């Protein structure tokens, strides 16, 4: 029987004149939380349930659908800049590819909570009793009219206003603990259409008009409008329902809990959370909860205790052994009685129903078996009562009553709070750059890298910098390249420091943006002498002077604490900075002019580098012009013949060529400061591949902090691509990194360090195993809201896969022959 009598906003009246207020509980992220954080959520939910001393609660987990096309269309609105047309075309192609892979819609679990509104005692005065009698009489007349005419359903405006006031108080109570949204008529209609087998409609696209006629004392709605969402041919069999529409049919089966045979220990009892990850098909769940007040609960428990004692005495008098079941039950009852007496808590009658649907009977059987096995593993025994399918179906409808008393479970608020209602895995944004999907839930993951600095509500960082860490071959460079590419398409600008020259073929492999790719390949050719001199590449003389000091102290090993050599070098650099033309070769001249033993020593030391391999790039005589332009959307800087030290090599063990290579990286990275200080309205990325090479030296570490701080002020993100999270884990840098991506690692110390970098429990073996077992292309990701999950990076297009793949090509058998 259809229970709903009237709907007004989020209020639902049923045929027994009970009124429920329904809300959508905005899901909260639950993945990778520490036990302490889980207990905080548990306590909040327990208090939410326990605050209702009487009445009923109806909790629903419903597998709704969200439109992929709609999300992609919203993402298009974020695109700006020169490559807008290319980006729009790319997003359209991406949409078609995603739809062909996973369909128009993807499953999106929503959580609904309904609370029965209880009339307060002060409303029992004479005036209200008179009004109540009058309303009852009017209701009788309306019922007669409805029975005879079967057209309109009416509700007194006074009645609506009275419950609306009560609902406001309730909403205020709940919203202190959880984010909620009041339901509307279209939410109820979607819910009913979903339960009656209609699918393929995205939740956000669904419309449902519920016209009302507001009269002076009452409001009318058409009865047909109320029942319209249930239009469908329902055929009941013993253990399933067949739901038939004009263009489709589906089969539905309902399970209920028969017994809980073991302890459901928290935290590992979060059924609502785990079943989202477990099942590849949609599963709906309903909890119909009736609150039993403390006094009534104690009476029930004490009566049960008397029954058990009678059984015990009867066995004793008959000379038999009391069965172990009775002894265990007596212990449990004693414990429960003490608990209820001390805590003054209520008990709860729980009717727990699971809905499984499928397009055909064979698939329904397979899915039912899978659901049953899942609950079996949790010590929960399910049953599919024959002939009760229609009744259990009714329990899912808003404001419905409990259908059957045979399968009631008596539970406490602790049990209900431990089921993980509202818990889900959320990652990234609702729209933006599609980078892949969550491994646990299969949901698409979208990012907006420029969002951190906007101070969006809920974000835990305003840092635009990002880190990509992981061992060789895990996919960090690929993920980094993909994110930079799409950021540029969406209107950003990027400069990539490419020490291994892996991106030199991008003009050929990315023809759609080739005109906006600028590859600067700096060779050690004599015509390029002095091209990377700090005085040549830096616009600001102060910045150039600062970089010149950094480079020369780095190469010569002179410390700023060296009271003999450092002042001499500093004076020479300052003098050159004040000249009309400046270059590092002039520093050597100034030192020779000084003509002291110390200055000659320093001059000789610096001069020994000037003609060593590609070091000539650093030394100019002041006549060289800056030939490096970073005005394109995507700029790649490559220095030929760089030899980077091994990750484990200490600074003291660097060879001369390695020392020079790192010096080059420091110069180019500092040059990126000028790029960062360009147009503040455009989001910019400075991408530092093999960042560990200069993060391990003092000058590089100082520079990275400088870049990150300048970036935050100037709408620019610095992306660190490195093999170890330890490189970016120093407090000064770690706190300024927003998005984090960690790829597979097998070293236990490195894994612990990475988990610590993410703010996770580094000693938790499950966390360690997750990171160790990641496949190629999968990463642990932390978004701007501090949420962590495992993402499968998904390029969608095969041409992007080839363009960004940095693995060496495998020779075919033909080549080998």
What are these model-derived regions, one by one?
Residues 1-410, 420-421:
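Extended, folded cores of ATP/NTP-driven motor/assembly subunits in large transport
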Residues 35-53, 276-279, 292-299, 380-381, ...:
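P-loop NTPase motor domains
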Residues 53-56, 109, 490-492, 517, ...:
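Short glycine-/polar-rich loops that comprise or flank the Walker A/P-loop
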Residues 60-75, 81-82, 92, 102, ...:
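Switch/coupling segment of Walker-type NTPase motor domains
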Residues 100-101, 540-585, 729-817:
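P-loop NTPase motor core of the ASCE superfamily
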Residues 125, 439-445, 450-452, 457-470, ...:
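Charge-patterned, long linear interaction tracts outside catalytic cores
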Residues 312-314, 450-484, 497-504, 520-526, ...:
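Conserved P-loop NTPase motor cores
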């Amino acid at each position: 029987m259809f229970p709903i009598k009237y709907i007004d906003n989020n209020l639902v009246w049923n045929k027994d004149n009970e009124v429920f207020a329904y809300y959508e509980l905005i899901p909260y992220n639950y993945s990778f939380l520490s036990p302490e954080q889980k207990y905080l959520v548990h306590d909040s939910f327990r208090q939410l349930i326990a605050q209702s001393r009487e009445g009923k609660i109806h909790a629903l987990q419903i597998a709704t659908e969200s439109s992929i096309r709609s999300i992609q269309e919203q993402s298009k609105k974020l695109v700006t800049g020169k490559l807008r047309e290319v980006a729009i075309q790319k997003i359209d192609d991406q949409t078609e590819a995603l739809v062909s892979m996973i369909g128009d819609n993807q499953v999106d679990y929503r959580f609904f909570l309904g609370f029965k509104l209880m009339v307060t005692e002060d409303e029992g005065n004479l005036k209200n009793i008179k009004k109540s009698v009058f309303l009852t009489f009017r209701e009788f007349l309306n019922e007669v009219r409805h029975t005879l005419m079967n057209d309109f359903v009416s509700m007194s405006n006074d009645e609506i206003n009275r419950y609306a006031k009560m609902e406001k108080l309730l909403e205020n109570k709940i919203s202190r603990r959880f984010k909620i949204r009041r339901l509307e008529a279209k939410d109820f209609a979607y819910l009913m259409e979903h339960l009656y087998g209609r699918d393929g409609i995205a939740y956000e696209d669904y419309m449902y008009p519920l016209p009302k006629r507001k009269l002076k004392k009452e409001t009318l709605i058409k009865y047909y409008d109320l029942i319209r969402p249930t239009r469908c041919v329902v055929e009941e069999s013993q253990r399933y329902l067949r739901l038939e529409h004009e263009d489709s049919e589906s089969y539905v089966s309902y399970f209920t809990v028969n017994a809980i045979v073991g302890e459901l220990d928290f935290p590992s009892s979060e059924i609502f959370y785990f079943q989202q990850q477990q099942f590849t098909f949609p599963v709906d769940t309903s909890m119909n909860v009736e609150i039993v007040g403390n006094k009534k609960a104690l009476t029930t428990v004490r009566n049960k205790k008397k029954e058990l004692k009678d059984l015990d005495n009867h066995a004793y008098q008959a000379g038999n052994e009391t069965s172990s079941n009775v002894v265990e039950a007596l212990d449990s009852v004693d414990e429960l009685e003490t608990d209820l007496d001390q805590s003054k808590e209520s008990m709860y009658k729980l009717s727990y129903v699971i809905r499984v649907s499928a397009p055909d009977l064979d698939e329904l059987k397979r899915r039912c078996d899978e659901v049953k096995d899942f609950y079996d593993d949790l010590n929960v025994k399910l049953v599919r009562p024959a002939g009760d399918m229609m009744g259990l179906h009714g329990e899912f409808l808003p404001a419905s009553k409990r259908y059957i008393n045979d399968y009631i479970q008596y539970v406490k608020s602790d049990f209900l709070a431990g089921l993980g209602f509202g818990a889900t895995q959320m990652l990234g944004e609702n729209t933006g750059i599609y980078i892949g999907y969550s491994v646990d839930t299969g949901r698409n993951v979208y990012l907006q890298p420029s969002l951190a600095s906007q101070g969006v509500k809920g974000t835990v960082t305003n840092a635009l910098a990002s880190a990509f860490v992981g061992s060789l071959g895990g996919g960090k460079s690929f993920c980094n390249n993909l994110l930079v590419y799409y950021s540029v398409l969406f209107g950003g600008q990027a400069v990539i420091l490419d020490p291994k020259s892996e991106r030199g073929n991008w003009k050929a492999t990315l023809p759609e943006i080739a005109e906006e790719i600028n590859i600067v390949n700096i060779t050690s050719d004599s015509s390029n002498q002095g091209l990377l001199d700090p005085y040549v590449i830096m616009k600001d003389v102060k910045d150039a002077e600062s970089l010149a000091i950094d480079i020369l102290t780095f190469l010569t090993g002179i410390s700023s604490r060296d009271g003999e050599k450092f002042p001499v070098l500093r004076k020479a650099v300052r003098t050159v900075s004040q000249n009309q033309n400046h270059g590092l070769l002039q520093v050597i001249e100034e030192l020779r002019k000084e003509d002291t033993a110390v200055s000659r020593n320093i001059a000789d030391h610096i001069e020994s580098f000037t003609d060593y391999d590609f070091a000539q790039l650093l030394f100019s005589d002041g006549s060289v012009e800056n030939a490096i332009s970073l005005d394109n959307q995507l700029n790649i800087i490559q220095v030929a013949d760089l030899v980077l030290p091994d990750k484990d090599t200490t600074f003291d063990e660097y060879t001369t060529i390695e020392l020079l290579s790192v010096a080059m990286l420091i110069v180019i990275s500092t040059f990126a400061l000028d790029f960062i200080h360009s147009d503040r309205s455009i989001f910019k990325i400075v991408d530092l591949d093999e960042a560990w090479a200069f993060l391990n030296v003092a000058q590089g570490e100082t520079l990275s902090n400088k870049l990150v701080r300048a970036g935050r002020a100037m709408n620019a993100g610095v992306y660190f691509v490195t093999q170890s999270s330890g490189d970016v884990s120093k407090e000064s840098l770690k706190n300024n990194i927003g998005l984090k991506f960690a790829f597979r690692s097998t070293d236990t110390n490195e894994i612990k360090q990475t988990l610590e970098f993410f703010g996770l429990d580094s000693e938790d073996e499950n966390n360690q195993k997750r990171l160790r077992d990641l496949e190629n292309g999968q990463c642990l990701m932390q978004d701007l809201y501090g949420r962590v999950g495992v993402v499968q990076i998904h390029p969608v297009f095969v041409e992007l896969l080839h363009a960004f793949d940095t693995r060496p090509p495998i020779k075919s058998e033909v080549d080998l022959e």
